[in-house]
């Protein structure tokens, strides 16, 4: 029969060997999470009041409608708008900032969500002072044409149950091509 000392040594070795897969899984999870955060930072290139997403070929306004880009951040009060008001503002932005500005699709706006962050669930370095609530998309709900999709940056969820006359925040986007 093996001595107590040998049995203890064997038990310790077995515990280490059994714990190794869990340790590896934990480390791999940390690496993946870190890589995802780095990829998000690399995907969005900041340029003053704009953020370019080269992967999806989009250019975002860093500030919500109502805010202005000043001193390297978004300042001012975010305007809560109906869909009709958002479309009017979008037309004004196209005139003043060049063509192409529009309300994002639900998929485009959902792409800005950072699931592992606290509210607001968005890269706050790229999109400072973001409203911790719902933002309009240009997509109507499939239930009825009176509902539109929104993306909520407090919860990180999408909703298709907001009436067009309700007021939400707006962040505009346009297609971007590299010349």
PLM regions with names:
Residues 161-179:
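Short, structured beta-strand segments at or near domain termini in extracellular proteins/domains
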Residues 36-41:
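Boundary at the C-terminal end of the N-terminal hydrophobic targeting segment
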Residues 24-33:
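Bacterial N-terminal signal peptides
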Residues 12-25:
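Bacterial N-terminal signal peptides that target proteins for export
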Residues 57-60, 136-137, 172:
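Bulky hydrophobic/aromatic "packing anchor" residues in well-ordered structure
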Residues 49, 54-102, 106-109, 113-115, ...:
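Short aromatic-cysteine micro-motif
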Residues 87-100, 106-155, 161:
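An exposed tryptophan-centered "aromatic clamp" motif
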């Amino acid at each position: 029969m093996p001595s107590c000392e040998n049995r203890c040594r064997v038990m310790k070795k077995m515990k280490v060997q059994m714990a190794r897969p869990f340790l590896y899984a934990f480390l791999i999870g940390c690496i993946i999470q870190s890589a995802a955060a780095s990829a998000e930072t690399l995907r969005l290139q900041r340029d003053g009041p704009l953020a370019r997403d080269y992967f999806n070929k989009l250019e975002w306004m860093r500030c919500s409608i109502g805010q202005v880009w000043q001193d390297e951040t978004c300042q001012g009060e975010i305007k809560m708008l109906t869909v009709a008001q958002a479309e009017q503002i979008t037309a004004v932005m196209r005139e003043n900032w060049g063509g192409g500005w529009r309300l994002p699709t639900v998929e485009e706006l959902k792409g800005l969500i950072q699931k592992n962050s606290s509210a607001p669930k968005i890269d706050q370095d790229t999109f400072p002072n973001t409203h911790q609530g719902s933002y309009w998309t240009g997509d109507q709900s499939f239930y009825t044409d009176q509902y539109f999709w929104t993306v909520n940056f407090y919860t990180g969820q999408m909703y298709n149950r907001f009436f067009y006359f309700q007021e939400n925040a707006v962040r505009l986007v346009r297609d971007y091509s590299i010349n």
